[in-house]
Amino acid sequence: MVKLLTFKDSLIMEDMIKMLADAPEEQKLQMVTERVKMIAGQPDDQRVQSVKSMVIAISKLDSKKKSPFHGTRIKAIMSLSPEERMAMMVARARAVPELPEDVDKEDTMYVVQSVKEYPEEKQKAFMTALTKAFDTAGIPMPEMA
């Protein structure tokens, strides 16, 4: 039996994101990397709920903190093994129907901005993996302008 996230779990994620948003970059990256690695190892349904909670929690940050936090999240995900990274991408794709449309669009925009900071080869690899993740999830790939 998979334990899905409760309201309390979502609040814990929200509190963690708020706290980390003000942390020094090195500490933020370390903590976010540990968290996404842990989430990548969760059972599928729980992983989707964890990713959803993280995306929603980040969306609640003030605008000055969102972009840097998304950059940190992408850096953490890029540091995972290919299997863990794909698990996170598939979970993000599967979370799309459960996210408010404005939150999903904003998150997608920040992901694209963050990925553009990487060399072209890494950008292409990320986008190829993301396309595969959406195909695996059976969810239409959003516009990535």
Residue ranges with predicted function:
Residues 2-145:
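Short amphipathic alpha-helical interaction elements located at domain edges
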